[in-house]
């Protein structure tokens, strides 16, 4: 089945928009503030779910794209989405905070470079 290549760019835009929202939500927070703010956590988790769902769609609909860009951690993003969506109250918020600060900027840069 052939898929519309414009959809690939749409999925990438969804991921980038979710990353930007997470960064905006957390811009004025340090780790302690994040760990104490359940509304912020919920907003961030929701956007990680968006990232994971778009990543899954890229993997399923455009498998050659991931083969061409093996350094993109989109499978990891989908697995994280599953852990968040099905972990309920077992989410490790410290890992989530580290992911926000240590991994999202790299993913954002990689995807922006692919779009240029």
Regions found by a protein language model. Name each.
Residues 1-116:
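Solvent-exposed interaction patches of small proteins and small membrane subunits
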């Amino acid at each position: 089945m052939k898929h519309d290549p414009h959809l690939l760019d749409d999925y990438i835009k969804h991921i980038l928009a979710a990353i930007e929202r997470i960064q905006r939500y957390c811009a004025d927070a340090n780790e302690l503030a994040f760990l104490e703010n359940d509304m912020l956590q919920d907003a961030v988790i929701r956007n990680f779910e968006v990232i994971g769902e778009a990543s899954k769609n890229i993997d399923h609909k455009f498998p050659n794209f991931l083969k061409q860009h093996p350094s993109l951690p989109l499978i990891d993003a989908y697995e994280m989405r599953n852990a968040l969506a099905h972990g309920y109250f077992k989410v490790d918020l410290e890992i989530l905070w580290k992911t926000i600060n240590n991994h999202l900027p790299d993913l954002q840069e990689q995807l922006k470079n692919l779009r240029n």
